[in-house]
């Protein structure tokens, strides 16, 4: 047992110094549990409350699309230059070295392909496996206005409930329903529904008109998808406008790994997201880095 005679009474209690409570300032996440906040603080840089994610989960329904034929050759060299990796568990286990030491957002929905109805997805990963992989969030598509809208919302609810049990954030990714136009009204509806169901992060698309209303009406952080490949200057302009209008980051794939200089593009995107560089200066950085 302890030698009680050798235990010295504490003296420096700082009685005149009130204890400070640290605030978790990420939008809408201040009341979450410690484990949930810890994972979110790995995804979002605590200094900026923003993030740059590299998405290479496309193969779960597209197969080996252009740029993703060989993850080890095309994507692995980009890992050091991004904040977060977004991929499936199959790619994570087979292609991402455990020593990479980057937070992972795990694609947790699937069971569909480009040959069938995309909205017909299921939860494709058990929460226990996500915990085993030590990821920082799970992600699933939500298809508002689609044939399988109800099913996709239930997928989000299932992940949120399981995530709350274990301290695992859920990112809802807004797919586009066939019967709705890709505009501010649609994405305001889709992002708000996903947030109301409890998702802690929303991934959606940038729109030229009214994006600030989408971001303002969503009570949790929004990150924008890169979408189809754009010329680098246009992609950087989209990033800048989204951040300027309230997005908390980007989750880009094709506009990174299909770029003529992927590392340079990632550095330029980082400058926009974390350093508030405008698109012109970021493009100049891209040009200088690609040489």
UniProtKB/Swiss-Prot annotation:
Residues annotated as catalytic: 203
Annotated SUPFAM superfamilies: Aldolase
Residue runs in coiled coils: none
Domain of life: Bacteria
UniProt keyword Transmembrane helix, yes or no: no
Subcellular location(s) of the protein: Cytoplasm
Listed EC numbers: 2.3.1.245
GO MF annotations, alphabetized: acyltransferase activity, transferring groups other than amino-acyl groups; fructose-bisphosphate aldolase activity
Catalytic reaction annotation: dihydroxyacetone phosphate + acetyl-CoA = 3-hydroxy-2,4-dioxopentyl phosphate + CoA
Chief localisation class: cytoplasm
Membrane spanning stretches: none
InterPro entries per UniProt: Aldolase_TIM (IPR013785), DeoC/FbaB/LacD_aldolase (IPR002915), DeoC/FbaB_aldolase (IPR050456), FbaB-like (IPR041720), LsrF (IPR033673)
Family label: Belongs to the DeoC/FbaB aldolase family.
Main function: Involved in the degradation of phospho-AI-2, thereby terminating induction of the lsr operon and closing the AI-2 signaling cycle. Catalyzes the transfer of an acetyl moiety from 3-hydroxy-5-phosphonooxypentane-2,4-dione to CoA to form glycerone phosphate and acetyl-CoA.
Name of protein: 3-hydroxy-5-phosphonooxypentane-2,4-dione thiolase
Organism for this UniProt entry: Photorhabdus laumondii subsp. laumondii (strain DSM 15139 / CIP 105565 / TT01) (Photorhabdus luminescens subsp. laumondii)
């Amino acid at each position: 047992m302890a030698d009680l005679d050798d235990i010295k009474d504490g003296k420096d209690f700082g009685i005149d110094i009130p204890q400070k409570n640290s605030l978790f300032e990420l939008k809408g996440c201040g009341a979450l549990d410690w484990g949930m906040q810890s994972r979110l603080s790995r995804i979002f840089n605590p200094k900026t409350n923003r993030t740059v994610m590299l998405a290479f989960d496309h193969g779960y329904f597209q197969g080996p699309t252009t740029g993703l034929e060989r993850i080890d050759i095309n994507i692995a060299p980009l890992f050091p230059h991004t904040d977060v990796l977004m991929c499936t568990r199959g790619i994570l286990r087979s292609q991402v070295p455990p020593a990479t030491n980057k937070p992972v957002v795990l694609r947790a929905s699937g069971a569909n392909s480009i040959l069938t109805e995309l909205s017909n997805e299921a939860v494709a990963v058990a929460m226990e496996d996500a915990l085993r992989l030590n990821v920082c969030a799970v992600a699933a598509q939500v298809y508002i206005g689609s044939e399988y809208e109800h099913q996709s919302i239930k997928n989000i609810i299932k992940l949120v409930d399981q995530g709350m049990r274990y301290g695992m954030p859920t990112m809802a990714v807004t797919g586009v329903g066939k019967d709705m136009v890709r505009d501010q009204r649609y994405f305001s509806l889709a992002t708000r529904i996903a947030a109301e169901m409890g998702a802690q992060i929303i991934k959606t698309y940038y729109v030229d008109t009214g994006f600030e209303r989408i971001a303002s009406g969503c009570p949790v952080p929004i990150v924008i998808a890169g979408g189809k490949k754009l010329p680098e200057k246009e992609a950087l302009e989209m990033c800048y406008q989204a951040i300027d209008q309230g997005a908390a980051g980007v989750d880009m794939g094709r506009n990174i790994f299909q770029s003529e200089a992927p590392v340079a593009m990632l550095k330029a995107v980082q400058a926009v997201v974390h350093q508030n560089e405008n698109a012109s200066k970021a493009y100049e950085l891209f040009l200088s880095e690609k040489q």
